[in-house]
Amino acid sequence: MNFPYRNIVVLTGAGISAESGIQTFRAQDGLWENHRIEDVATPEGFARDPDLVQDFYNQRRKKLQDPNIEPNAAHLALGRLEAELDGQVTIVTQNIDNLHERGGNKNIIHMHGELLKSRCSVSNQVIEETGDILTGDLCHCCQMPSQMRPHVVWFGEMPLRMGEIYSALETADLFISIGTSGVVYPAAGFVHDAKMHGAHTIEINLEPSAIESEFVEKRYGKASVEVPKLVEELLAHLESNVENA
């Protein structure tokens, strides 16, 4: 690695939050918490059975606020990296939880939305939401009050803040992917974009992802072990550069 890095982009997926007790979508059988994805994570599913979809996310929202769900060592290490790096750290997460915020990160892009927010299905106005959203809960920001929905990007919808993400990738000198499968686009293409602009690339995963060949460096193991080790290396080189200045 060419130390020190000043513009780091970190892409995180379900693998980083799994160790905190957040259950993930099982790609092998297409189920999420025993529900079919098309039933609970698509606009069509919401139109077909809004009560089912609202209840599904209400349960996920309750689970996220369980006192036993806490940031793990990987989240805390990334928070430390942002706080101590002499430069920019951008967290681009596919996760809808708030564990990066609770781990200390501030510069976070939630490309798939946030579970603790809701939005108007017409105007897209977003509000904080810690309780249940029910069918019949209306947003009064519009001329015609409209149904509130989870602030979550469903399959078939456009991810959020893509312009900001691509701008960060253009200036990144280090791109790290943590806990991602490498099968969901556009996120799976970020490593290629970062490489095209000259960034060093690192994959941290339990096992090789579908795009592992795109990465220059690979580290396999638990995120709670591998991420703190990498952050220690990055900050140690930063300190040595300061001492030698």
From Swiss-Prot:
Its cofactor is Zn(2+). Belongs to the sirtuin family. Class III subfamily. It comes from the Bacteria. Its EC number is 2.3.1.286. Binds 1 zinc ion per subunit. GO terms for cellular component: cytoplasm. Substrate binds at Y57, R60. It catalyses: N(6)-acetyl-L-lysyl-[protein] + NAD(+) + H2O = 2''-O-acetyl-ADP-D-ribose + nicotinamide + L-lysyl-[protein]; N(6)-succinyl-L-lysyl-[protein] + NAD(+) + H2O = 2''-O-succinyl-ADP-D-ribose + nicotinamide + L-lysyl-[protein]. NAD-dependent lysine deacetylase and desuccinylase that specifically removes acetyl and succinyl groups on target proteins. Modulates the activities of several proteins which are inactive in their acylated form. InterPro entries: DHS-like_NAD/FAD-binding_dom, NAD-dep_sirtuin_deacylases, Sirtuin, Sirtuin_cat_small_dom_sf, Sirtuin_class_III, Ssirtuin_cat_dom. Residues 1-237 form the Deacetylase sirtuin-type domain. The active site is at H112 (proton acceptor). Pfam families: SIR2. Its main location: cytoplasm. This is NAD-dependent protein deacylase. It is found in: Cytoplasm. CDD domains: SIRT5_Af1_CobB (cd01412). GO terms for molecular function: histone deacetylase activity, NAD-dependent; NAD+ binding; protein-malonyllysine demalonylase activity; protein-succinyllysine desuccinylase activity; zinc ion binding. 2 residues (Tyr-57 and Arg-60) present in a large hydrophobic pocket are probably involved in substrate specificity. They are important for desuccinylation activity, but dispensable for deacetylation activity. The lineage of its organism: Bacteria, Pseudomonadati, Pseudomonadota, Gammaproteobacteria, Vibrionales. Keywords: Cytoplasm, Metal-binding, NAD, Transferase, Zinc. SUPFAM superfamilies: DHS-like NAD/FAD-binding domain (SSF52467). Gene3D superfamilies: SIR2/SIRT2 'Small Domain (3.30.1600.10), TPP-binding domain (3.40.50.1220). HAMAP family: Sirtuin_ClassIII. NAD(+) binds at residues 13-32, 94-97, 179-181, 205-207, 223. Zn(2+) binds at C120, C139.
